[in-house]
């Protein structure tokens, strides 16, 4: 009689999702989510730091029926002070600041006067059906003012969401967001 040994299943201890300070920046939450390896852990991290601002950004980014009224691409703005220091669009400057912060692995949370947690209620102004009476110039000016007040990494996220390109930088998919916000299996199939 021969006995076959069953392979031992080794389970790796699940690493806990790191804690963030109260009211974290959106980029901090997305960085924590990005570090998770499995979809289940990413969804768990998103649930842990769930906030209406994240939901609004995910809807704008992943819902095809939400149409941005802002022009796609770079945000074409620079103040006189910025032009004296360097040239380029606001998007370029935000990207440069963001990459410098990532390169130095430092985050100065004092940069920016506001956060997406506070400003998300104004996002309706930038999508079709939100505030259609607003003229294009005023809409773009409002968007630029919000970007200038945000932390550069949050501003970069808002620029990505405007163009529905959040998934190009962060490992977050539409199906992952559906898993996060659907309550039953019937709703899950409609996310497809």
Task: Report each predicted region and the residues it spans.
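N-terminal nucleic-acid-engaging modules of covalent nucleotidyltransferase systems
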Residues: 1-183, 190
């Amino acid at each position: 009689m021969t006995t076959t040994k069953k392979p031992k299943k080794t389970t790796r201890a699940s690493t806990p999702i790191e804690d963030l300070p109260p009211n974290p920046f959106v980029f901090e939450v997305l960085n924590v989510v990005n570090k998770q390896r499995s979809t289940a852990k990413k969804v768990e991290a998103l649930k842990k730091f769930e906030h209406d601002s994240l939901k609004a950004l995910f809807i704008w980014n992943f819902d095809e029926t939400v149409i941005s009224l802002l022009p796609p691409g770079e945000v074409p703005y620079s103040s006189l002070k910025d032009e004296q220091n360097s040239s380029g669009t606001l998007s370029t400057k935000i990207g440069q600041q963001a990459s410098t912060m990532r390169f130095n692995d430092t985050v100065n949370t004092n940069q920016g006067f506001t956060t997406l947690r506070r400003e998300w209620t104004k996002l309706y102004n930038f999508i079709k059906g939100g505030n259609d009476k607003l003229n294009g110039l005023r809409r773009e000016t409002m968007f630029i003012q919000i970007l200038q007040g945000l932390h550069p990494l949050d501003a970069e996220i808002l620029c990505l969401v405007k163009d529905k390109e959040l998934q190009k930088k962060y490992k977050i998919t539409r199906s992952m967001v559906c898993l996060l916000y659907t309550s039953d299996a019937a709703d899950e199939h409609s996310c497809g």
